Amino acid sequence: MANGADRLDLDGKPIKPMTICMIGAGGFIGSHLCEKLMTETPHKVLALDVYNDKIKHLLEPDTVQWAGRIQFHRINIKHDSRLEGLIKMADLTINLAAICTPADYNTRPLDTIYSNFIDALPVVKYCSENNKRLIHFSTCEVYGKTIGSFLPKDHPLRQDPEFYVLKEDISPCIFGSIEKQRWSYACAKQLIERLVYAEGAENGLEFTIVRPFNWIGPRMDFIPGIDGPSEGVPRVLACFSNNLLRREPLKLVDGGESQRTFIYIKDAIEAVLLMIENPERANGHIFNVGNPNNEVTVRQLAEMMTEVYAKVSGETAIESPTIDVSSKEFYGEGYDDSDKRIPDMTIINRQLGWNPKTSLWDLLESTLTYQHTTYAEAIKKATSKPVAS
C-alpha cells in the first residue's frame, strides 16, 4: 500500500485518506475497485452488499496489510435503516447497485425500474442532505439508439462519427417505444442521472456520473448452474464463456450484428480511482468510460473468444462454433437494441488525462484464462453426474 503522504493528485496536491461508502461492493466492478483501494491506497471502505462472495479474499485474512480498512455490511438498500448512518460516516459514497443484465430488462421490467431508480433515490437524498460527495454509476445504455440508426442502411452519413459516436454533453438519448420494455433499464438509469444532476444544480450536491461501456474481466456475472441460477442468462462475455466451457455453440442474437466496444476492468478501475482522488476535476461531470479502439460486432467477438479460448484451454473449437437465434427466442417479447455504442473520450481525457490501454485480444486472453481455471473442472463434474432414474 502506498503511504498516503507520498501520493499526489493530478494537480500535485497531497491525497488525504478518506472513508468510502461503496454500495454494491460485492459485485463485479465493486470487487475490483475494493482490490484497487486496498492494495494501492490508504483509503477505508465500508462495503455494502447483499453478498460478499467476490470480495471474501479481502475480508477473511486478519493478517493482511489492509486489515481494518475494509468492513462488510450485509445490507439490502431497499429497506435498511442503517444506510443513512453509513453514508454519514463516509467522505464519499459510490453507488454501484443495479440490475444490469439485458435478459432481465423486458422479463423483469418492474424489478429493473425499481432497482435502478426507486432504490437509488434514498442514496441521492442522503448524500445531498448530508453534504456528502456521490459517484453514481449509470450506463452507456442511457444514450439508447444512435442518430445514424434511423438513416437507410446504405446512407453515407451512417459512417460519419457525428451520427454514432456518443458524447456526454451533446448526444441525445433515444429510446424505443414503450412496448419495447428492454428500454426500462436505460430509462430508469437516465431518470436517476437527471435527479442527481438536478440535486447538484439546486442543492449543491457534489457528484460524478460514470457511464460504463461494456467493462469485462474476471468475476463478471456468473456461470449458470455453477455459481448462478441454471436458467440465468448473464451478459455477453459470461454467456459466451459458458458456451465455450460447455463446448456448446455461441448463440448470436439477431445474427450478432450489433457493434460494441469492450474495455478491460483494470483499465476502467484506473479511471474510477482518478475520479475518487481528483474531486475538483471530477465533480459535476459525466464521464464515458470505454475503449473505442476495441470495437467489434458481437459476431466478431464470438469468433475472437472462440480462438482465444482454444489457445488458453488447449481444446480445439467445436465444428459449428456459433448459431443464430432471434432476439424474441433468446430474450423474449419486447426486446430491442442499439446498433452501436462508441464512446467519445474527450471529456475524461481532458479532465483526468485518462486513456484505456488493453487491447481486446489481451483482455480476452486474461479473462478466458481466469474463466477456464475457475470453472472448467466444476463444469466437467457437473456434466458428468449420472442422471437419476
Swiss-Prot record:
<comment type="subunit">
    <text>Homodimer and heterodimer with AXS1.</text>
</comment>
<feature type="binding site">
    <location>
        <position position="28"/>
    </location>
    <ligand>
        <name>NAD(+)</name>
    </ligand>
</feature>
<keyword id="KW-0520">NAD</keyword>
<dbReference type="GO" id="GO:0046982">
    <property type="term" value="F:protein heterodimerization activity"/>
</dbReference>
<feature type="binding site">
    <location>
        <position position="182"/>
    </location>
    <ligand>
        <name>UDP-alpha-D-glucuronate</name>
    </ligand>
</feature>
<dbReference type="GO" id="GO:0010396">
    <property type="term" value="P:rhamnogalacturonan II metabolic process"/>
</dbReference>
<dbReference type="GO" id="GO:0071555">
    <property type="term" value="P:cell wall organization"/>
</dbReference>
<dbReference type="GO" id="GO:0042802">
    <property type="term" value="F:identical protein binding"/>
</dbReference>
<keyword id="KW-0961">Cell wall biogenesis/degradation</keyword>
<protein>
    <recommendedName>
        <fullName>UDP-D-apiose/UDP-D-xylose synthase 2</fullName>
        <ecNumber>4.1.1.35</ecNumber>
    </recommendedName>
</protein>
<feature type="binding site">
    <location>
        <position position="29"/>
    </location>
    <ligand>
        <name>NAD(+)</name>
    </ligand>
</feature>
<feature type="binding site">
    <location>
        <position position="185"/>
    </location>
    <ligand>
        <name>UDP-alpha-D-glucuronate</name>
    </ligand>
</feature>
<dbReference type="Pfam" id="PF01370">
    <property type="entry name" value="Epimerase"/>
</dbReference>
<feature type="binding site">
    <location>
        <position position="189"/>
    </location>
    <ligand>
        <name>NAD(+)</name>
    </ligand>
</feature>
<feature type="binding site">
    <location>
        <position position="77"/>
    </location>
    <ligand>
        <name>NAD(+)</name>
    </ligand>
</feature>
<dbReference type="GO" id="GO:0102765">
    <property type="term" value="F:UDP-D-apiose synthase activity"/>
</dbReference>
<feature type="binding site">
    <location>
        <position position="253"/>
    </location>
    <ligand>
        <name>UDP-alpha-D-glucuronate</name>
    </ligand>
</feature>
<dbReference type="GO" id="GO:0005829">
    <property type="term" value="C:cytosol"/>
</dbReference>
<feature type="binding site">
    <location>
        <position position="215"/>
    </location>
    <ligand>
        <name>NAD(+)</name>
    </ligand>
</feature>
<dbReference type="GO" id="GO:0005737">
    <property type="term" value="C:cytoplasm"/>
</dbReference>
<dbReference type="InterPro" id="IPR036291">
    <property type="entry name" value="NAD(P)-bd_dom_sf"/>
</dbReference>
<dbReference type="GO" id="GO:0005576">
    <property type="term" value="C:extracellular region"/>
</dbReference>
<feature type="binding site">
    <location>
        <position position="335"/>
    </location>
    <ligand>
        <name>UDP-alpha-D-glucuronate</name>
    </ligand>
</feature>
<keyword id="KW-0456">Lyase</keyword>
<feature type="binding site">
    <location>
        <position position="341"/>
    </location>
    <ligand>
        <name>UDP-alpha-D-glucuronate</name>
    </ligand>
</feature>
<feature type="binding site">
    <location>
        <position position="76"/>
    </location>
    <ligand>
        <name>NAD(+)</name>
    </ligand>
</feature>
<dbReference type="GO" id="GO:0048046">
    <property type="term" value="C:apoplast"/>
</dbReference>
<keyword id="KW-0963">Cytoplasm</keyword>
<feature type="binding site">
    <location>
        <position position="185"/>
    </location>
    <ligand>
        <name>NAD(+)</name>
    </ligand>
</feature>
<feature type="binding site">
    <location>
        <position position="251"/>
    </location>
    <ligand>
        <name>UDP-alpha-D-glucuronate</name>
    </ligand>
</feature>
<dbReference type="InterPro" id="IPR045869">
    <property type="entry name" value="Arna-like_SDR_e"/>
</dbReference>
<dbReference type="InterPro" id="IPR001509">
    <property type="entry name" value="Epimerase_deHydtase"/>
</dbReference>
<feature type="binding site">
    <location>
        <position position="331"/>
    </location>
    <ligand>
        <name>UDP-alpha-D-glucuronate</name>
    </ligand>
</feature>
<feature type="binding site">
    <location>
        <position position="235"/>
    </location>
    <ligand>
        <name>NAD(+)</name>
    </ligand>
</feature>
<feature type="binding site">
    <location>
        <position position="105"/>
    </location>
    <ligand>
        <name>UDP-alpha-D-glucuronate</name>
    </ligand>
</feature>
<feature type="binding site">
    <location>
        <position position="141"/>
    </location>
    <ligand>
        <name>UDP-alpha-D-glucuronate</name>
    </ligand>
</feature>
<feature type="binding site">
    <location>
        <position position="337"/>
    </location>
    <ligand>
        <name>UDP-alpha-D-glucuronate</name>
    </ligand>
</feature>
<feature type="active site" description="Proton acceptor">
    <location>
        <position position="185"/>
    </location>
</feature>
<feature type="binding site">
    <location>
        <position position="139"/>
    </location>
    <ligand>
        <name>UDP-alpha-D-glucuronate</name>
    </ligand>
</feature>
<feature type="binding site">
    <location>
        <position position="49"/>
    </location>
    <ligand>
        <name>NAD(+)</name>
    </ligand>
</feature>
<feature type="binding site">
    <location>
        <position position="214"/>
    </location>
    <ligand>
        <name>UDP-alpha-D-glucuronate</name>
    </ligand>
</feature>
<comment type="function">
    <text>Together with AXS1, catalyzes the conversion of UDP-D-glucuronate into a mixture of UDP-D-apiose (UDP-Api) as the main product and UDP-D-xylose to a lesser extent, via a cycle of oxidation and reduction. D-Apiose (3-C-hydroxymethyl-d-erythrose) is the only plant cell wall monosaccharide with a branched carbon skeleton and is found in rhamnogalacturonan II (RG-II), apiogalacturonan, and several apioglycosides.</text>
</comment>
